[in-house]
């Protein structure tokens, strides 16, 4: 391997380390903000305050706070050294981390107030940008930042394709070359596999009655005598055997689908286990894409998803989805279960959406919440 290859590999690893450090510190800062909002009325955490909770619970809260604050402090210096490589979204994440660390400069977060800066932060930010632009290494830092973002995008797309294609390929290949021949071979010897389900039996009986009526109707239209009992019996016997084969095939098809789905699930879990680092990069990539949207675009996407899954016309979509899943798994689509599911699950989803907007989006992007309310009729 040449020197350029070694340098490229080192730069790629360094960029992934920066993304990982920024993601960990950002999640820790969000955890601290969540503790402030939930237990301290959106004020800084104070370890000398009694929260009125059980001692074990209060101890756990403070332990989580200290751990998150240590992560922010430990990673902040290394991230700030590579500030020039960060894009606009990552700089916003870094600003959140810095604001959290500044709030807790004293030991154990005892201070409630911090001394105001002598100059506005926006003016200091302008000076900092000018200094970075005049830095002799500014061009190298910009190129390094571009390479890091490019590597992050490639890693994200690769793990995303693996998470989609590996389960699909495993499902189709295992079903075609392993599961189907195996089930077809052992099904006649195992009563459970060759047993025709009651729903399929009822469908076969209805088809047989319809076939008998078609024979009699065709004889009346052609002006012929009705078939004799023996002829009718022979035709019905052949049709019954055909319907039984179709029912058996449909029954084994459901079993094949279930086994293939299990194989696909195992493949997906293995991809997630062996690609934990890449999944962290993928999360950062999605965060960058989502937070890079304008406020109107964010509000539009939220309204679109809520209307699809919990909106006025969502019951029809849930009905079609549940019936398709039931047919795929070979189980009867019970109307009572579908009605109960539609009456409860969309309500739970709507509650989760509202809680997420109140708890998270309202802090990260208040302007998006305002735009969302305006686009949603003020609700």
From Swiss-Prot:
Topology with respect to the bilayer: Multi-pass membrane protein
Entry function: Required for H(+) efflux immediately after light irradiation to form a rapid H(+) concentration gradient across the thylakoid membranes. Together with PxcL, contributes to transient H(+) uptake following dark to light transition.
Stretches that traverse the bilayer: 153-173, 254-274, 300-320, 337-357
Stated family: Belongs to the CemA family.
Gene Ontology cellular component annotations, sorted alphabetically: plasma membrane
Subcellular location: Cell inner membrane
One Pfam family recorded for the sequence: CemA
Tree of life domain: Bacteria
Protein name (database record): Proton extrusion protein PxcA
Gene name linked to the record: pxcA
